[in-house]
């Protein structure tokens, strides 16, 4: 069964590769990436933040990196901002922690601020959640740029 994001990509005729990871594989994710010949620096994590001026901010950063709050606040124009509680994340995105996907969030909330770390500009392919824990997609960066309007920015420490 396909996720809503996968169904949307097929409807729009956007090429992607579905990736599934069982619980054991999630525990040994780096090994699985190597087996599937996926550059770990092309794997995205989608973070949901709450700013005092902009409201919900969706930040997409490399899986192995940490978000720099100060840089993110400067880009968003917020004085205060950070990670809200899980209840807020679920209510604001419709996705549980670990399943947030920028494609799915944008389809429901095009008014949110979407920021993507500038390091992804150099990548041909990106791997990101497809909206369910253990489910991801591999998609061309150029296709991602066409379906989710976002700003590239230096977001990591």
Task: Annotate each PLM feature.
Residues 1-157:
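Extended, low-hydrophobicity, polar/charged segments
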